[in-house]
């Protein structure tokens, strides 16, 4: 799933969870040794889909797995289905995070931005958050990505269940490389200071 705006989610269910699902919540047996005993579904959040059609155009399945339909024909079934899928945690720990398939089972920490429908930037940013999101530090250059990425009061970068997520800042001046390098140096300085304090005080800790 390209999941450009995080409105498409891969879902893994146990047999018991599948039995409790709405009747329209169709699943198939999940493929791969990592997912033995699980059932798989791609769930669309119709209320946040922007209707660009990119996902349907590039879906790699031999038989089209994503088909565009008028939203009015989908909300009645897909909204309850999406809400049901939210009851279960992401199951990325079952597989290799740093693979195309495995990365998609990690929570995207970029959700429902105000970017234009079909934006080519958000898919990459969303994938980065699935790979490194809980420890990402972003120094955003000024441009489209700073508008959809940080226009008050909307902020699409979010946190996981532990409260961890990307740190984001933007410099209006055309110095994003220097600006972000300064963030890197400051981070290293803080870490070094912690090491110095711990080293100095370790003998006094009972």
Regions found by a protein language model. Give the residues of each.
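Non-heme iron-sulfur electron-transfer modules
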Residues: 5-41, 47, 61-101
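N-terminal amphipathic, basic-rich helices that act as targeting or association modules
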Residues: 110-142, 146-153
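Glycine- and acidic
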Residues: 37-44, 104-115, 175-180
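Catalytic or ion-translocation cores adjacent to nucleophile or general acid/base/metal-coordination motifs
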Residues: 12, 63, 69-78, 147-178
């Amino acid at each position: 799933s390209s999941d450009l705006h995080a409105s498409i989610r891969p879902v893994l269910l146990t047999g018991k969870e599948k039995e409790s699902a709405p009747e329209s919540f169709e699943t198939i047996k999940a493929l791969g040794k990592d997912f033995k005993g699980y059932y798989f579904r791609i769930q669309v959040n119709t209320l946040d889909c922007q209707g660009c059609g990119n996902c349907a155009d590039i879906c790699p399945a031999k038989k089209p797995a994503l088909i565009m339909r008028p939203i009015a024909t989908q909300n009645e079934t897909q909204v309850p289905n999406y809400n049901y899928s939210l009851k279960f945690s992401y199951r990325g720990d079952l597989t290799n995070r740093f693979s195309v398939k495995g990365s998609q089972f990690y929570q995207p920490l970029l959700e429902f931005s105000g970017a234009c429908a079909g934006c080519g930037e958000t898919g990459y940013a969303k994938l980065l958050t699935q790979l490194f999101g809980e420890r990402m530090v972003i120094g955003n250059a000024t441009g489209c990505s700073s508008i959809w990425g940080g226009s008050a009061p909307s902020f699409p970068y979010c946190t996981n269940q532990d409260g961890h997520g990307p740190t984001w800042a933007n410099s209006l001046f055309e110095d994003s490389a220097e600006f972000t390098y300064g963030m890197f140096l400051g981070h290293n300085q803080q870490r070094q200071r912690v090491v110095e304090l711990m080293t100095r005080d370790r003998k006094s800790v009972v």
